[in-house]
């Protein structure tokens, strides 16, 4: 109940007005009022409830603006210390004022200041150098050696997750109706299946493996094992 919070009465009034004036045929018309609501919530004292409602309000703004964004790669996996090819994509399908200001990802940072036109694709391709010590992708219960009869899971917040957190997160800074929003998207492996179309799956980070030989030449007869 917003009335329990200091200044919550005005916010409740704004929410009621947005709901009553919402037009499902033109959801973009609600974006200016939602941005005003977002600013009002942001001015409240910092607490978990405020932060939760900011996230939810931003999600509503993105949905009503029909703003689609993704970060993808054509590589199924990448090795520590290797190069990762990236593709960024944005499209705004409703008529609201929006501008792409920045895209950030690890050591990559690029300024754009590109107005997002109605239903016009904005694409950008680049490559980044993966850090040699980048955390590899593996089940969270195998990060540490197994103890007798039990797995050593030191980060209890990981328990129950179907997938690990994405190793790379792209952060788009988009200005909507004069307010800056940070929109985060995981970098996913994107490919096309002839029958199913575009598909996504988590990007995997593999460890760097090096090998060396003790002799210059090896000869194996009929696939026999070498000594």
What feature does the model see in each segment?
Residues 1-62:
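The feature marks non-catalytic terminal segments
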Residues 14-17, 86, 107-111:
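Structured, charged N-terminal subsegments at the starts of enzyme catalytic cores
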Residues 38-82, 108, 190-226:
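Low-complexity, acidic Ser/Thr/Pro/Gly-rich terminal tails and inter-domain linkers that flank the onset
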Residues 69, 86, 101, 124-126, ...:
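Hydrophobic residues positioned within well-ordered beta-strands of beta-sheet architectures
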Residues 85-93:
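Short edge beta-strand/loop segments characteristic of extracellular beta-sandwich folds
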Residues 93-110:
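Short acidic, flexible loop segments centered on an aromatic residue
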Residues 109-121:
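Low-complexity "stalk/linker" and mucin-like segments enriched in Ser/Thr/Pro/Ala/Gly
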Residues 119-186:
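Eukaryote-biased detector of low-complexity, proline/serine/threonine-rich segments
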């Amino acid at each position: 109940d917003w009335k329990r919070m200091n200044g919550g009465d005005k916010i409740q009034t704004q929410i009621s007005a947005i709901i009553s004036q919402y037009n499902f045929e033109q959801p973009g018309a609600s974006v200016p009022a939602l941005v005003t609501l977002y600013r009002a919530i942001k001015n409240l004292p910092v607490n978990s409830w405020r932060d939760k409602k900011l996230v939810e309000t931003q999600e509503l703004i993105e949905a009503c603006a029909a703003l689609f964004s993704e970060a993808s790669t054509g590589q199924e996996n990448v090795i520590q210390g290797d190069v990762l090819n990236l593709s960024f994509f944005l499209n705004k399908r409703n008529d609201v004022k929006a501008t792409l200001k920045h895209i950030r990802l690890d050591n990559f940072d690029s300024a754009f200041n590109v107005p997002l036109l109605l239903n016009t694709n904005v694409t950008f391709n680049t490559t980044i150098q993966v850090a040699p010590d980048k955390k590899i992708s593996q089940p969270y219960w195998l990060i540490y050696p197994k103890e007798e009869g039990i797995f050593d899971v030191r980060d209890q917040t990981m328990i129950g997750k179907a997938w690990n957190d994405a190793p790379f997160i792209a952060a788009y800074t988009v200005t909507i109706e004069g307010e800056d929003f940070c929109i985060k998207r995981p970098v996913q492996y994107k490919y096309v299946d002839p029958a199913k179309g575009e598909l996504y799956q988590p990007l995997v980070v593999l460890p760097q493996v090096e090998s060396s030989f003790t002799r210059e030449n090896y000869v194996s007869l009929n696939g026999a094992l070498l000594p």
